[in-house]
Amino acid sequence: TVLYEKTEQIYKQAQDWTTPIRVDVKDPRLTGDYQIMAEFVLSHMLQNTEARNQYLRDLKALNWDQFLNIDRLSKDKKNNYAETEQMLKNVHAVVESYAQQVEQRQKEAIAQAKDLAISSRFRHQLTDSMKASEKSHEATRLFSLEQQNLAKADQIFLVLKNNQWEKKNNTFMFYEDAPLQQFNALYKEILALNSQMQQVEKQTQKEVEQKL
C-alpha cells in the first residue's frame, strides 16, 4: 500500500541521520478519509524521525561521541576540564530540549488527530493507535537509554575530575584503587547501555522489514 511504501522511504532515508529526510507525504493514488489519514500519519512520522535525526546531528556537532576519548581528556585535564564541562552542559541542553519537543509534538498530534475531517470511527482508531505507539516507539526506548547514558557520563566525569589519573597504554590509570573501581563499574554500565541501544535498533529494523 501507499502508506507502507512511504513508511519504507522514510525509514530508509532515516538510516543516514546526517542528511535531512526528503519524502513527499502526498500521493495522487490516495483519496477520501484514507488520504487525509495517511498524510497525517506520514507527516507525524516524518517530523518525529527528522527531529530525532536533528538531535543526533546536534550531539555529533558537540563531539559527544568523543566524550571518553582518553587523548581528548588527557589534554583537557591540563585545562581544568573546561572543554568537557562545557560539552556536558551543552549535551544536557540538547537532551532536555529534545525531550520537551517530543512531548509537545505528541500532544499536538493527538489534538490534531481529534479534529481531522474524517469519520469518527477512523478518528478514534487513529488517536488510540497514536497513544499506544507513543510508549512502544523505538525512538522513545532509545532516548530513555540515552538519558541513562548521560547520567552515567556525569558520574564517570566526576570520578575523573576528582581523582588523580594518567594515560598509560591507552587506558585510564588511577593512583588509588577506589576511584579505579568506581570508574570501571561505571564504564561497564555505559557499555551495557550502548549494547542495549544497539539491540533496540536491530530489533526495530527487523520489525519494520517484516511489516514492509
What do the PLM-derived regions correspond to, one by one?
Residues 1-81, 85:
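Leu/Val/Ala/Ile-rich N-terminal alpha-helices, chiefly Sec-type signal peptides and the beginnings
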Residues 5, 12, 123, 173-175, ...:
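Compositionally biased, low-structure terminal segments
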Residues 35, 39, 124, 130, ...:
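Generic alpha-helical secondary structure signal
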Residues 48, 95, 146, 190-193, ...:
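Amphipathic alpha-helical coiled-coil segments
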Residues 60-172:
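Extended amphipathic alpha-helical interaction segments
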Residues 165-212:
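A cross-kingdom marker for long, charged
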